[in-house]
């Protein structure tokens, strides 16, 4: 339906655009709750991945101050706060470089950076935020906390996504954005800003990923494709990890043998198929190592008080390395000691 509605409007005269498919964590799956969410005056459009845990408190304060809301989302709370913060800052709130921008674009970008930094200080939870302004529609300003954000660097075009799969068919050059950093993106330049307000050098890397892996290759669904790819995937995984004596060599595991031998319990955490992989590993570890293994969904592990001792090994499994529930579960495990 979305494609039909967009196509019905004819060609869009725009250089930059944002969009996001959001799980209905706040509010029902309705058009009013869909992204992007707009500021009350229509100046700003914002998309958000993650969960703002203090959204209800912030919304109540805004309503008490005269604001009205059109949706049930935590995202709309953020864009309301951003519009207010934008009016409270000046271009002098950030004096560093801004993605090669000049004139009105530069002024708007500087104010958006200041506003974004002010808003993120009020938010509790995990988020990636992208915002555009109708005063400078060629610029996107983004921020992240405990939620992934990757920039794709193209030729005369740049991309923002939670994973390289969002843009790998267009470019294999990428920049990962750090915790609590703000980024200004135009079609030609990218500026990354640290939490203290200082610009930082881009940490560019090359994506070793073929866009063919993002297609169904003739299968009706990705699920069927991945099921039939499993034998080859297991073979490819083991191929470089078996030495000349036929023994498994896991050089990536940088844990001293003495520490591994002291482990008396293993907890494996993951989401979806990563959790299933943990179930398979449980059989192997308990059979050959005679060490008890627990397997738990990351989303459940992070909300309970697990028994994690000094000799407990917690293994996190994630296909992307960016599964938010799993990352939060790792932090929770570390807090247990």
Regions found by a protein language model. Give the residues of each.
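Conserved short alpha-helical segments that host acidic/polar catalytic motifs at enzyme active sites
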Residues: 1-221, 229-264
